[in-house]
C-alpha cells in the first residue's frame, strides 16, 4: 500500500475513518474480483434458441477454450445426473469405454451440488422463463460460492492480527477471477480459513471439527 500513497507520516491520522474500515474495503475488493470472476464465465452461459422445437441448450462450440470460460458445474449438471434429480453417489453412468462412473467429489461438495441442483429446479418450476435450468444452477451455485469466499476472506482478516491489509492479497488475487467459479474449491477454502481462525483463538476442538469438514469438502 505504500506504493499508492507513500509511507505513513508522523502526523497522519490513522484509523479515523468510521465507515471505510480496512475490513469493509477488503470486502469491497473481494466483491469486485468475484464479479470479474463471474463475468469471466459469461461466454459459456450463452444459450442456443433452436427453431425446430427442440429444447434450448448451452452454446459452447469450443468457446470454453478460446474464451477461457470453462466451468465444471455446467457439463457435470447433466453428466452426474443432477439435472434428473439424482442423489449423488447413488446415480451412475457408463462411459464410452464401458466403465461405470459415480460422482467423484468429496461428500460435502457432492451434497452442495445436489442442494444447488434442487434449488435450481425449484427456481425453474416457479419461474420457467428466463435462463435455462443449467444456467440457473450455475448462477445459484456461484452466489453460494461467493458467500463462502467472503467468509474465507473475513476469517483470514480476523486471523491477520496486526497485518490486516495482508488480506487484500487474498481478496484481490487474480486467481479469483479465473478460478472462483471453475469448480467447488471455495467450499474447502472457507472451512480451512475458519479452522485457522479458531486455532488462532485457541479453540482446538472446534478447529479440528471445522478442518475435518473442510477435508470432507
Language-model features: locations:
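Short acidic/glycine- and proline-prone juxtamembrane loop motifs at membrane-interface regions
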Residues: 180-188
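Residue-level signal for helical boundary/lining positions with a hydrophobic bias
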Residues: 102-103, 169, 181, 214-215
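Specific aromatic-rich, kink-prone transmembrane helix
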Residues: 155, 174-175, 188-206
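Alpha-helical hydrophobic/aromatic positions enriched in membrane-embedded helices and signal peptides
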Residues: 98, 175-177, 210
Amino acid at each position: 500500500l505504500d506504493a499508492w500513497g507513500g509511507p505513513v507520516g508522523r502526523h497522519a491520522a490513522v484509523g479515523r475513518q468510521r465507515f471505510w474500515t480496512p475490513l469493509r474495503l477488503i470486502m469491497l475488493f473481494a466483491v469486485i474480483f468475484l464479479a470479474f470472476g463471474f463475468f469471466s464465465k459469461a461466454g459459456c452461459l450463452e444459450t442456443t434458441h433452436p427453431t425446430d422445437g427442440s429444447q434450448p441448450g448451452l452454446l459452447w462450440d469450443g468457446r470454453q477454450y478460446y474464451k477461457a470460460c470453462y466451468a465444471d458445474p455446467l457439463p457435470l449438471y447433466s453428466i452426474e445426473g443432477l439435472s434428473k434429480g439424482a442423489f449423488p453417489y447413488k446415480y451412475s453412468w457408463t462411459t464410452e469405454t464401458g466403465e461405470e462412473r459415480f460422482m467423484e467429489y468429496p461428500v460435502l461438495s457432492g451434497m452442495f451440488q445436489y442442494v444447488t441442483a434442487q434449488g435450481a429446479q425449484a427456481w425453474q418450476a416457479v419461474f420457467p422463463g428466463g435462463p435455462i435450468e443449467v444456467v440457473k444452477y450455475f448462477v445459484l451455485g456461484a452466489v453460494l460460492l461467493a458467500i463462502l469466499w467472503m467468509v474465507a476472506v473475513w476469517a483470514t482478516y480476523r486471523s491477520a492480527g496486526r497485518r490486516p491489509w495482508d488480506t487484500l492479497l487474498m481478496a484481490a488475487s487474480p486467481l479469483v477471477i479465473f478460478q472462483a467459479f471453475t469448480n467447488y474449491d471455495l467450499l474447502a477454502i472457507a472451512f480451512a480459513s475458519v479452522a485457522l481462525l479458531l486455532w488462532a483463538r485457541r479453540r482446538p476442538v472446534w478447529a479440528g471439527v471445522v478442518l475435518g469438514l473442510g477435508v470432507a469438502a
